[in-house]
Amino acid sequence: MKNLKSLLSFLFASFWVAIPLIALYACACAIATFIENDYGTSASKAIVYNTPWFNFLHAYLLVVLIGTFINSKALERKRYASLFFHSSLIFIILGAAITRFFGVEGLMHVRENSAQSSFESADTYLNITLNDEKKLSLKTSLTFYYSKRLKPIHATLDHKPLILEPLEIYKQNAIKKDDATILVLKATYNGVSRKFNLIKNNRNEGVEESEMFKDDKLSLSFGSAYIELPFQIKLKRFELERYAGSMSPSSYASEVEVLKLDNTLIKPYRIFMNHVLDYEGYRFFQSSYDMDEKGTILSVNKDPGKIPTYLGYAMLILGALWLLLDKKGRFLKLSRFLKSQQIASFLLALILISPFTSSFANEGQIDMHGGKSAKIERQKIENPANKEDSKSAILERLKRLREYSKDHLKAFQRLQVQDFDGRIKPLDTIGIEYIHKILRKDDFQGLNAMQVLLGIMFFPNDWRSVKMIYTSNKALRKLIGTPLDESRIAFRDAFDSRGYKLKNLVEEVNQKSPNARNELDKDALKVDERINLVYTLFSAQFLRIFPSDKTTAWLSPIEAINSPNKEISSVATEFLKNIFSGFDDALKTNQWDKVEKTLKDLSVYQQEHAKNLYLSSSKVDSEIFLNHTNFFNSLTLPYIFLGLLLFIVVISSLVKNTIPNIWLTKILYMAILLCAIAHSVGLILRWYVSGHSPWSNAYESMLYIAWASVIAGFVLRSKLALSASSFLAGIALFVAHLGFMDPQIGPLVPVLKSYWLNIHVSIITASYGFLGLCFVLGILSLVLFILRKQGRFNLDKTILSISAINEMSMILGLFMLTAGNFLGGVWANESWGRYWGWDPKETWALISICVYALILHLRFLGSQNWPFILASSSVLGFYSVLMTYFGVNYYLSGLHSYAAGDPLPIPTFLYFLVAIPFALVILAYFKRHLSLPKLV
């Protein structure tokens, strides 16, 4: 009996089982993401996510979690904070189970002035109809096309047995993201057997096939089933807004009515992005639309597991805060240990405040809602540059533009423009924003951004043939018809005699849900946006420089010319005549007086009519200063160099068992402090210029991570911590300037206008900073382990201090990563109707949570070498974060292009990034024997 009790305790209440289970769970999720990448979503669900063994793994984890609580006597030991925090996982798992087994989701297609009382399920069914009357839907997991063990399905129809024997199931084509499937099966009914070839398309819609079984007609389809609703949704009107001068959609909405089944009106409603219809437990989200714009596609969701799941999320966040403040908790025990080591730790106060004061989100995009007319009536203005010219004349103009305009850009740079979000900014900023987005860099052929902008505006015909629009996908370049080895295309390349070459592709991509888009789709949308931006520059729709007395909206030239206000129309016409003729003359004679006078007159007009919107001279100067000083990028090398130098100084003193050179350490300390002050000034300057806290996009989030890292190093008052944080700050700034993040100052409202999204991204991004610090501290610890010798007790003391800092940083990073990930689920559920969809990005975030949870619980296995284990695992565990942040985009979603393509080459430095830490772990292993004292 005692042995049985011990066995049960081991199997259901032991960390020796719980930790391997977490590792197994993380590995299963990781494998599933690669299966999805190679074979599609249906394959990953059939092999992992929707399987009984994966469901069992969740249940086993839940039982072991409860059993471990009971076995550890957490309640008797008054570990209330830990009990409350971990209990949240019970509610989250139970809520997910309720959603998984009892929730329904699908799509509803409604045409204008018609109503629907059913929707198509997201799950796959075998739909059976007997004699066009009796219907039966059998839920099936026949979705993986390599399955060889297909089991027969038995059912009863009209009191007669029906046997369905799947013979074969395979994909219709080789495209990864295309789940179009053919199911071959044999149906036996009424003593007769017939063979069916059932086709399911990429939208999970089945094509019905019929056969006669003696006197009975049996119809089968493989795909969605229709789920009936107790009410109707009627579409009154579908609205689609497009970007000015293009066919690309910017937003869409459905005006609907909720009706009873007898057509009695219940209520009208407007459904659009992030504005959901809730009725009788069902939620309706705007998903897509018909090509003729006369119908809408709504995502439908009914989730009975929402309440326990949300309760679990709330408990998790509150429990995390409680654990950080609990005197009996690990975090404050580590803090007290650090104080005993004469290291002041105010890290907790810094981090608990900093992430919640930020609200940065995804990269901002330019929202082009300008004039409705795309045709600027330049024929009214004699512009010599508008005429077609020879190639030599064009090259000569470009040469003069490069040479003559360089010293006369200031007046253009300071000209104030209102962007499409209503923000007033200097034209210099507009130029950098637009040109950076079009080119993916800030200069081109010896021209800076402002010169490129002026060239496009004043000589549009010259620039229609210039290959400047960046593309990243060879398949897209093949579609457009440009050389595959040239990453840039010309505006003219995107058009032929039939019109815009990307029109159909962009329309198709916008029909897809975001998680169904492949790399070709994503690049098509980006290139489409760049082409729209170039067109906006050609047509001067962006040049909103004429203030209106009646509204706060400024007018573009065409809007001003066509304005009923004769004063504005006259000013705009005169300005355009003078500026075009003056600019053309300036490039011929290098005389800029007329241009500068015209711009000065316009500035005076703006100041008189814009009132409070007109920017002060200091704010304009500050913004232009930020645009051209490359402020934050200049701090990258100093941060890295000073951090490494301080590390070498400290390590050298430890090896020699001497005190570090006081003057040298003070100089390095002051140098890093000056960098931090400059960093802070830069952030404050961005704050002043933008009018809001500078955490509005991904670029600024990296600036924030770098700043928080270096400040944390100062607060900890440890030379090693400061060297690590300085190095990490430099790396963060390096990543921010790699070229895939737009550095422009954007509006506070993100592209996806959601408060939850702000919180989600801010907390998760901040967590990466702390887990990155764990990586650096782990490397430091391993190096110190390698340098250990008898008699170097100060080395051991330093390792223990770093270990405590490392564990505290990891606790904070894990809490923030977990809270941020689940809050992202809240945003997704409130915006799209699904808080978890096993998307590779969110799955790898979950894997990272599992990895760091596993690391922090390894100490419960009773090892005596916790500092070494923590150092090694904090280094190796960081690869899960790198996979989440970079790997998912480049080696899962972006591994192949649409239908074909070469794998993305693995950079050489990546091999060293993996090999060096592993080598350090192996070398440190031989000197691993060091225990952390008991914490009180």
Give residue spans per PLM region:
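Hydrophobic alpha-helical segments
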Residues: 1-49
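Membrane-interface segments at loop-to-transmembrane junctions
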Residues: 11-12, 45-49, 77-85, 337-344, ...
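Hydrophobic cores of alpha-helical transmembrane segments in multi-pass integral membrane proteins
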Residues: 15-34, 52-67, 84-98, 285, ...
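Short, hydrophobic transmembrane alpha-helix segments
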Residues: 39-48, 73-74, 651-660
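Internal alpha-helical transmembrane segments
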Residues: 46-125, 297-346, 358-361
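Soluble non-transmembrane domains of integral membrane proteins
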Residues: 107-304, 359-625
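Bacterial N-terminal signal peptides
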Residues: 347-355
